[in-house]
Swiss-Prot record:
Its cofactor is Zn(2+). An L-alpha-amino acid binds at E176. It is an enzyme of class 6 (ligase). Keywords: ATP-binding, Ligase, Metal-binding, Nucleotide-binding, Zinc. GO terms for biological process: tRNA aminoacylation for protein translation. This is Amino acid--[acyl-carrier-protein] ligase 1. NCBIfam families: PRK07080.1. It comes from Bradyrhizobium diazoefficiens (strain JCM 10833 / BCRC 13528 / IAM 13628 / NBRC 14792 / USDA 110). Homodimer.
Length: 326
C-alpha cells in the first residue's frame, strides 16, 4: 500500500529566508505583530531625507496637508472603499457602554474571558491611503478654479495584510501629490509626475521599471475591476526588483480615478462638470527598505551622488549603527 508523505505542518516546516530578512535587525524591532514594527534611528533618518527630497520637487501652487492616522468612517464609506477593499479595512472600536457594562468587560478579561465581545465600532477608521480625506475638504470649497487644485498630503496608513515581508507592512507611511480638475489637468499632472518620479528613482541609484497595474480589488467582481483598470491604463507603478524581476515591489504609483471622487463628493471643475482626480503615491517605507537593500546599511558606503542628494554628511565620529550621519 502506498503511504502519502505529508508536508511539514506550518509549525514545523522550515522557514524560507526572504531576501530582505538581512535588514530586519538593523532597521526594525518586533512589536509582537507581523508588519508592525518599531523603527530605528538609522531607518528613520532615511525616511525623513526621502520625504525632504520629495518635498523639494513639490510644484508651485500645491497646498500641503498632513492627516492623522484615522479618518471619518462615514467619509470612507461614502468614498466607496468598502465596495472595493473591505478585507483591508481596519476599524477603530471601543468600550462604549455604561460604567456597569464596561466594568463587566474588564471583569471578563481578569477572569480570562473574551472582553472583546463588548467592543463596538467608533465613528473612525484607520486611514488606508493618504488621499481619502482631501476630497471632502476640496468639495467644501465650492467649484474649482481654472487649472484645478493640487495637494501634497501624507499620513500614517493601515491595511490589514499581515506579512513577515519587510516590504509589506500593515502600518506604513504614504506621501501623495493629488490633482483635482479637468481630465486634461489630471492627465498632464500624472504625465509630469511619472517623468519626475523616475528621475528621482534614478538619482537614488535604484533599479526599476514602470508598468501598468491594478489595485487589489476584493472578490470575483474585484477581478473584473482589475482587468478594466489595466485595460484603461488608469494605474501605473514604479516597480523595484527587491526579490526578483518576476516579483518586483511597487514603491510608487500613478493613479487616475476619472470622475469617481468628483461625482461622489459633488466637486465641480471650472466648466461645471464633475471634477476628475489623480494622484502620485510614494510608499515611504518601501522606498526606505529599497534604499537599504540596494546600498546597504552602512551609510558611509553609499554612492557619493546618493549621499549628496539626500544631504548625508559624515559626522566626525560616525556611530556603529550609522547614527553619526545626519
Amino acid at each position: 500500500m502506498n503511504i502519502a508523505v505529508l508536508p511539514n505542518s506550518p509549525d514545523t516546516a522550515p522557514q524560507i529566508a526572504d531576501p530582505l530578512d538581512h535588514l530586519a535587525d538593523k532597521l526594525f524591532h518586533s512589536m509582537g505583530s507581523d508588519g508592525v514594527y518599531a523603527r530605528t534611528a538609522l531607518y528613520e533618518s532615511i525616511v525623513e531625507r526621502l520625504a525632504a527630497l520629495i518635498t523639494s520637487h513639490r510644484e508651485a501652487g500645491t497646498e500641503a496637508l498632513r492627516f492623522p492616522p484615522v479618518m471619518s468612517r462615514a467619509q470612507l464609506e461614502k468614498s466607496g472603499y468598502l465596495k472595493s477593499f473591505p478585507n483591508l479595512l481596519g476599524c477603530v472600536c471601543g468600550l462604549h457602554g455604561t460604567e456597569r457594562e464596561i466594568n463587566a468587560a474588564v471583569s471578563r478579561f481578569d477572569a480570562g474571558g473574551d472582553w472583546t465581545t463588548s467592543l463596538s465600532p467608533a465613528d473612525l477608521v484607520l486611514s488606508p491611503a493618504a488621499c481619502y480625506p482631501v476630497y471632502p475638504i476640496a468639495a467644501s470649497r465650492g467649484p474649482l478654479p481654472k487649472g484645478g487644485l493640487r495637494f501634497d498630503v501624507a499620513a500614517d496608513c493601515f491595511r490589514r495584510e499581515p506579512s513577515k515581508h519587510l516590504d509589506r507592512l500593515q502600518s506604513f507611511r504614504m506621501r501623495e501629490y493629488v490633482c483635482i480638475g479637468t481630465p486634461d489637468d489630471v492627465s498632464d499632472f500624472r504625465e509630469r509626475w511619472m517623468v519626475r518620479a523616475q528621475a528621482i528613482a534614478r538619482d537614488l541609484g535604484l533599479t526599476f521599471r514602470v508598468d501598468y497595474a491594478s489595485d487589489p480589488f476584493f472578490g470575483r467582481v474585484g477581478q473584473m475591476k482589475a482587468v478594466s483598470q489595466k485595460q484603461q491604463q488608469l494605474k501605473f507603478e514604479l516597480l523595484i526588483p527587491l526579490r526578483s524581476e518576476e516579483q518586483p515591489t511597487a514603491c510608487m504609483s500613478f493613479n487616475y480615478h476619472r470622475e469617481h471622487f468628483g461625482t461622489t463628493w459633488g466637486i465641480q471643475d471650472a466648466n461645471g462638470e464633475p471634477a476628475h482626480t489623480g494622484c502620485v503615491a510614494f510608499g515611504m517605507d518601501r522606498l526606505a527598505v529599497a534604499m537599504f537593500h540596494t546600498h546597504g546599511t552602512d551609510l558611509s558606503a553609499w554612492p557619493a551622488k546618493v549621499r549628496d542628494i539626500l544631504g548625508l554628511q559624515p559626522h566626525v565620529a560616525a556611530g556603529a549603527h550609522g547614527e553619526g550621519w545626519r
